[in-house]
Structures are given as structure tokens and as C-alpha cells.
Amino acid sequence: TGINLISLEKPGYNPVRSMFLDAAFNICDVDVLDNGININALPNNIKSAVYVNPSNQFPTGVVMPAANRYEILKWADNNDSYIIEDDYNSELRYFGKPLPTIKSLDKKDRVIYLGSFTSTLFAAIKISYMVLPDELSKIFDNNRNNYSQACSKAEQLTLAYYMSQGYYYTAIRKKRALFTKKLKAVTEAFDKYKYEGIELLNTNSGLFVTIKINTSTDEKLYIDSAKKLKIFTDYVEDISNSTQKCIMIYYSYIPLNSIDLIINILFNKWRLL
């Protein structure tokens, strides 16, 4: 393809960064704004690619508006470049109208679309998929025998049947309804028990919320407090600094009827740090 430069969202998903670095790509970090990646900061006059999470940016939860989706397509067309659209968890959007994927708006074959069933089904089924532009599809077909297929055919056929019978969409509706209630419970508990210097960032989609805390205390103490309550958390290094810590709380693992109590206990412990 003649591409050796990849633009990545900052903050972003670090395993993707490692993958591109291992493949010897040069990396261009581009800040994430309130409306998604800063399109004006993308490289111009050079063929490249950009990796984005438009439906639920990791880890900020920012959703790219429709206008920006058209704008990034314009950038790709003007610079003979590609957009890698990782649409993970796009089905798990709880509030507001669903937005069209960048791929569905693409008239110039500039989008590589990635999706996965890991979050919407369960992690044991490692089934993902990729929709390539025609030009790249031909390159892929010529090279695919050099790589092994990690997903079993039995699982793929089972999933195909599951979807053909409408079971998948029924499961998504049920999961979306449950997680909508869980997210609502989290935001209500946050409003009830929050303390000065703590801020909730993303409240529209996904399986986690991101919390920003104004503190110089070691983030490991916050993580350890959550772990003792059996809350799965993670630290967002790219957003954090010496006076501000950013932590993700995966509320999807917390029983609905326990969320209020657990958030209350967690915040009481954090106040003591």
C-alpha cells in the first residue's frame, strides 16, 4: 500500500500502538478532543492511515459526531489515505440516536472496518471481522495463506446460525437494556456520593465509565481499593499526571442491585487516601 505512517488517538488503546510498532510503522499521536480525534492535526500531503474509535473512543468514551465523520473521510480522500474504523462496542450505545458508521458513509473506498463479538457475546468466543476496501481486499487474498485462522469453523458456523435465527439481536437488546439500567445506576450513585475533585467523563456507551480525580496520591492505591471490593478497574496513564488521576471502572461486572452500595463504599475509601 505504500503506507508506513499510522496516526493514533491520544489517549488511546495501547495494545494497538504496540501492534503497529511491532510491524515497524511510524506513529503519529493525535489528540482526542470533545468531538473525537483532532482531524486538523492529521498528516497532510502524505499517504498514511488513521486508527479511530468513532462510536466509543477508548478510554474517553467520546462519540464522533456525523459532521466529523464526513470531515475525516474528506481528509482520507484528499491525502490518498485510509481510515481504520474500529467499531468495538458500537451496539452498546444507550442514549441518543445511533450514528452511521464511517464505513457506511464512505463513497471512495477509504475505510477499513473492524468489529468484534467479544463484548456483545462473551470473551471466550474470540470472533472478530474486517471489511476491506477492494484494493486492499485483493492484497489480503494474495497473502492470507501466510497467516493462520485462530477462530474455529464450528464457532463461526454456530454464530452464523445464532444470528440467522435472530437470537443475536435479541441478546443485544436484552444486554443493552440491562447495561442502560446499570449505567443509570452508576451515574445516580456518582451524583449522590461524589466528592470535590472527582469527575465522571463518559456516560453514553460502552462497558465502563472513566473517572478523573484531582489528587497527587499514587493511582495504585485507588486501584487496590477497588480490587478489594471486587471492582474491575484500570488506570488511564495518557490522561493522568502528577496532580490528576484517571481511572476506568467496569460497571458491567457489578450486579445491578449492588451498584449504589458499592459506589458509596468505594468513594468513602477513596476519600481516605
Where are these regions (language model features)?
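Conserved core of the PLP fold type I
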Residues: 1-79, 84, 91-92, 97-105, ...
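Conserved glycine-rich beta-strand-loop-beta hairpin in the small C-terminal domain of fold type I
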Residues: 12, 176-187, 198-212
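Domain-scale detector for complete catalytic domains at protein termini or as standalone homologs
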Residues: 20, 42, 111, 125, ...
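Active-site PLP attachment segment
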Residues: 104-139
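Conserved PLP-binding active-site segment of the aspartate aminotransferase-like
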Residues: 132, 210-215, 232-270
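Active-site C-terminal subdomain of aminotransferase-like
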Residues: 137-155
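Structural signature of PLP-dependent enzymes
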Residues: 141-145, 165-187
